[in-house]
């Protein structure tokens, strides 16, 4: 999906000062979870590392984390992050899995350059794929993952069981919500005055919030709800991931490309594009020819009618979100920054209606379009339709668009991420001292998000156990 949280991605570091226990309302939530052992061979070593790959729909990103423990028995802290990325994403190599895995192999050189050779054998390496691979036929997705796993096994790093897997979309939303509300201090105490999160990736989109009214819980599909405990409080979240509703997947749906068998010799046209435009676009390894309506309508109203068909009646609309405020990131942030609705570095606060206003401005001036993305009108119109007619937000709903919370990155643009280093003293609470092994330090990542998070998950009928995802 978005990633690209990856979106998502920010890479996030969150520290949980106690166990986090999840209770899912259905038995099958995600696959490929695993335990990781980040135990240094020499338990007195003060520095250790972790490698996370985020395989998003538009690119693959590597994050190399450095942790330091200043004294035995003390909590380790995050000292820094090294980031790099390649495009296109793994899904573009659906028919060439070995070639796709080579993009991961190239990024492993970043890890080798960043981590002392003496630490290689005890540094775990993990790859989590998101919506891009979820959209592929299972056989092709698994072929890619198997090739990546072989690359990992040939590397000098520690390869945990199930180190390569596809992340469940809803988990992306949960991680984003926990991260933002933890970093803003909203999870401390018992007020539960939290903010919801919206993440828009390339292939999927997530919405997550803490319902305040029992009516919302009663009217919500059971598999949209997740309960967990943190800081002696219980949180029952509304969270759902919509596969195929990411920004770039929505372009294909708007163009009608998803309903057409074969793309050779076919040009997909839209009222959302400049009339004179004739171009090609590659997404998911497929080349699409597209252009404007040479004789037909053009502008906001006909464009909005096209994107409305993509979302109308297809998303659940919890009534209480109309009066709530949300954090929004990934492509929400990008398109707002691209059109100067917010400052690119600082972000800002918008109302839902601001996206519509900018969409009208851009779409009704397509004749004078000269630079930037030819999809800008379509993207802004889709974001407007997704927020208003998809999720059911009110025009006046406030959205906090941000890349960082307390100087920790929470999201990044899918596809054009730049190297970043995150420094700080975010302490991680380990359930056991480092000298007895940090097996409960969970190494997790998402499209836009990556986290190290101590987490305990319980499926119905099972005892709480420690998962790594």
Swiss-Prot record:
One GO biological process term is: UDP-alpha-D-glucose metabolic process
Got any disulfides in this one, which pairs? 272-303, 363-377
- Organism source for this protein? Mesocricetus auratus
According to its record, what are the GO cellular component terms? endoplasmic reticulum; extracellular region
Which InterPro entries does this chain map to? GDA1_CD39_NTPase
Entry keyword set: Calcium, Disulfide bond, Endoplasmic reticulum, Glycoprotein, Hydrolase, Magnesium, Proto-oncogene, Secreted, Signal
Catalysed reactions, as listed in the record: a ribonucleoside 5'-diphosphate + H2O = a ribonucleoside 5'-phosphate + phosphate + H(+); GDP + H2O = GMP + phosphate + H(+); UDP + H2O = UMP + phosphate + H(+); IDP + H2O = IMP + phosphate + H(+)
> Quick check: keyword Secreted in the entry?
yes
Q: Where in the cell is it found?
A: Endoplasmic reticulum; Secreted
Q: What else is known?
A: ENTPD5 has transforming capacity and tumorigenic potential.
Q: In which tissues is it expressed?
A: Expressed in fetal cells and most adult tissues.
PTM section of the record: N-glycosylated; high-mannose type.
Q: What's the encoding gene here?
A: ENTPD5
What the record says about family reads: Belongs to the GDA1/CD39 NTPase family.
Among Pfam families, the record links this protein to: GDA1_CD39 (PF01150)
- State a single Gene Ontology molecular function: UDP phosphatase activity
The protein's name in its UniProt record: Ectonucleoside triphosphate diphosphohydrolase 5
Question: Where does this protein act, in terms of pathway?
Answer: Protein modification; protein glycosylation
Q: How does it assemble?
A: Monomer; active form. Homodimer; disulfide-linked. Homodimers are enzymatically inactive.
Reported cofactor(s): Ca(2+); Mg(2+)
What exactly does this protein do? Hydrolyzes nucleoside diphosphates with a preference for GDP, IDP and UDP compared to ADP and CDP. In the lumen of the endoplasmic reticulum, hydrolyzes UDP that acts as an end-product feedback inhibitor of the UDP-Glc:glycoprotein glucosyltransferases. UMP can be transported back by an UDP-sugar antiporter to the cytosol where it is consumed to regenerate UDP-glucose. Therefore, it positively regulates protein reglucosylation by clearing UDP from the ER lumen and by promoting the regeneration of UDP-glucose.
């Amino acid at each position: 999906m978005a990633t690209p949280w990856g979106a998502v991605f920010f890479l996030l570091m969150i520290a949980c000062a106690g166990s986090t226990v999840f209770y899912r309302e259905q038995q099958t939530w995600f696959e490929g979870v695993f335990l990781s052992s980040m135990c240094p061979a020499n338990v007195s070593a003060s520095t250790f590392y972790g490698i996370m790959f985020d395989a998003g729909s538009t690119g693959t990103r590597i994050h190399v984390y450095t942790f330091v423990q200043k004294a035995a028995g003390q909590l380790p802290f995050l000292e820094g992050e090294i980031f790099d990325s390649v495009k296109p994403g793994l899904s573009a190599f659906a028919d060439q899995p070995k070639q796709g895995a080579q993009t991961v192999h190239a990024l492993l050189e970043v890890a080798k350059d960043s981590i002392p050779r003496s630490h290689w054998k005890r540094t775990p390496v993990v790859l989590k794929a998101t919506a891009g691979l979820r959209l592929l036929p299972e056989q092709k997705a698994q072929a890619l993952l198997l090739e990546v796993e072989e690359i990992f096994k040939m590397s000098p790093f520690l390869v945990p069981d199930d180190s390569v897997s596809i992340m469940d979309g809803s988990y992306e939303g949960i991680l984003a919500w926990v991260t933002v509300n933890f970093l803003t201090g909203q999870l401390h105490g018992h007020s539960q005055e939290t903010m919801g999160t919206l993440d828009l990736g390339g292939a999927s989109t997530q919405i997550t919030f803490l319902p305040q009214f029992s009516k919302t819980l009663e009217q919500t599909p059971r598999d949209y709800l997740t309960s967990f405990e943190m800081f002696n409080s219980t949180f029952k979240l509304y969270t759902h991931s919509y596969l195929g509703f990411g920004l770039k997947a929505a372009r294909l749906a708007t163009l009608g490309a998803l309903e057409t068998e074969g793309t050779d010799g076919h040009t997909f046209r839209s009222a959302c594009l400049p009339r004179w435009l004739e171009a090609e676009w590659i997404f998911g390894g497929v080349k699409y020819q597209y252009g404007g309506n040479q004789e037909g309508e053009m502008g906001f109203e006909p464009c909005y009618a096209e994107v409305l068909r993509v979302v109308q009646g297809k998303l659940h609309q919890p009534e209480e979100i109309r009066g709530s405020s949300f954090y929004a990131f990934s492509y929400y942030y990008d398109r707002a920054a691209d059109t100067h609705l917010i400052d690119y570095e600082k972000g800002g606060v918008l109302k839902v209606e601001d996206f519509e206003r900018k969409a009208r401005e851009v779409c009704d001036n397509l004749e004078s379009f000269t630079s930037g993305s030819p999809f800008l009108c379509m993207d802004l119109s889709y974001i407007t339709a997704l927020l208003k007619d998809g999720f059911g937000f009110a025009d006046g709903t406030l959205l906090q668009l941000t890349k960082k919370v307390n100087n920790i990155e929470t999201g990044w643009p899918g596809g054009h991420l730049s190297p970043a280093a995150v420094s700080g003293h975010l302490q991680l609470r380990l359930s056991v001292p480092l000298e007895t092994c940090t097996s409960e330090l969970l190494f997790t990542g998402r499209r836009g998000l990556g986290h190290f998070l101590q987490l305990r998950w319980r499926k119905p009928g099972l005892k709480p156990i420690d998962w790594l995802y």
